Curated annotation (Swiss-Prot):
GO cellular component: a single term: cytoplasm
Species assigned in the record: Oceanobacillus iheyensis (strain DSM 14371 / CIP 107618 / JCM 11309 / KCTC 3954 / HTE831)
Function, as annotated: Catalyzes the NADPH-dependent reduction of L-glutamate 5-phosphate into L-glutamate 5-semialdehyde and phosphate. The product spontaneously undergoes cyclization to form 1-pyrroline-5-carboxylate.
Molecular function terms, GO-annotated: glutamate-5-semialdehyde dehydrogenase activity; NADP binding
Name the UniProt record assigns to this protein: Gamma-glutamyl phosphate reductase
Family per similarity comment: Belongs to the gamma-glutamyl phosphate reductase family.
Domain of life: Bacteria
Listed HAMAP family: ProA (MF_00412)
Catalysed reactions, semicolon-separated: L-glutamate 5-semialdehyde + phosphate + NADP(+) = L-glutamyl 5-phosphate + NADPH + H(+)
Any GO BP: L-proline biosynthetic process
EC number(s) per entry: 1.2.1.41
Amino acid sequence: MSEVIEKAKRAKQASFKMALSTTDDKNEALQLISQAIINHKQEILTANALDIEEGKKKGLSEAVIDRIRLNEERLQDIADAILQVTILTDPIGEALEIIEKDNGLFITKKRVPIGVIGMVYEARPNVTVDAASLAIKTGNSVVLRGSSSAIESNKALIQVIHQSLASSSIPKEAVQLIEDTRREVANQFFQLNEYLDVLIPRGGKQLIDTVIKQSTVPVIETGAGNCHVYLDESAKVEMATEIVLNAKLQRPSVCNAIESLIIHRQWFEDHGLELLKTMQSHDIKIHGDSVVMEKFPPAIKAVERDWEKEYLSSEISVKIVDSVSEAIDHINRYGTRHSEAIITENKMNAEQFQLQVDAAAVYHNASTRFTDGFEFGYGAEIGISTQKLHARGPMGLEALTSTKFVISGSGQIRE
């Protein structure tokens, strides 16, 4: 039996035990994991250094290296995120609806675990812990398939998780890592309908498209982040500048960073050159349309692929439009339905943008960088869904549950 089938089978068996776990059981396990990550930080960082070294040898970009990189601060953030999950209300067992029939039947619609969640993700080792913690809290098993670029980090984290679970009431088999990172193993993983209830890809567009095309397991699509900020005609200059710089530069390699800036023509005429010079002074490489090129020659001429590209670095495309409607049309054509922002003092334009833009999160006068489970109060997230069925936006605890009808009677039969 192959590794992937064997581990998926173990996870499936563990999921039935997980269904009996109490909130206290789950929280105790998460507290143990959080503390163990801090206690074993040196082993984790040593493993991470191997991934970083190997990544540099392979010529991975600095953006990818940053995604792989762990340090004491990031490990503390990971541990804190786990503790945040422990204080969240456990959704499992919640009665969503109670119906009492005339014949005496009690029908209760309850929130229950999904069962076994398959995760496919790229360079971020923090996803290993995020996915495990959310799965445990919601009574699910999880099978993780990360990238070869972070395999040593993932193995070290899973070892810490398993050691912690061994001291808890939660079966360690509920969290599995596929260590074989070959593509053919991934393809096998995508078709384990017998063991997996859902598959969640988390990464770039190519990974997500591959999973959607090849998977026979139901998929929750977490989209790439080709996010936009639109500066409307009435946008305040200082606010617009601060939001653009934050949304682009605070952490360029993440999915809620902006990749494209859209500017109303009048605003651009009045303030555009000043903004572009400020962006250039922050080492942002600008790809502009013909209007931008005319006013700011240092820019690079934007081509079609720039409007749909997720740079994941200090690069940005800039387009000039004549109206909020034109900005919306551009976003709906090239965006990835993730996070979009409008900066404006015009309430009607803000409302039009919020209603017509097709995205999981739509902002008015705020940075797109807030699209995050922790920022939204969900604790660690398993991904940001850009589809419209089952879950949309940051996927916290409730997104990892299903429902079950529990019917209690006293001998009723249907006549």
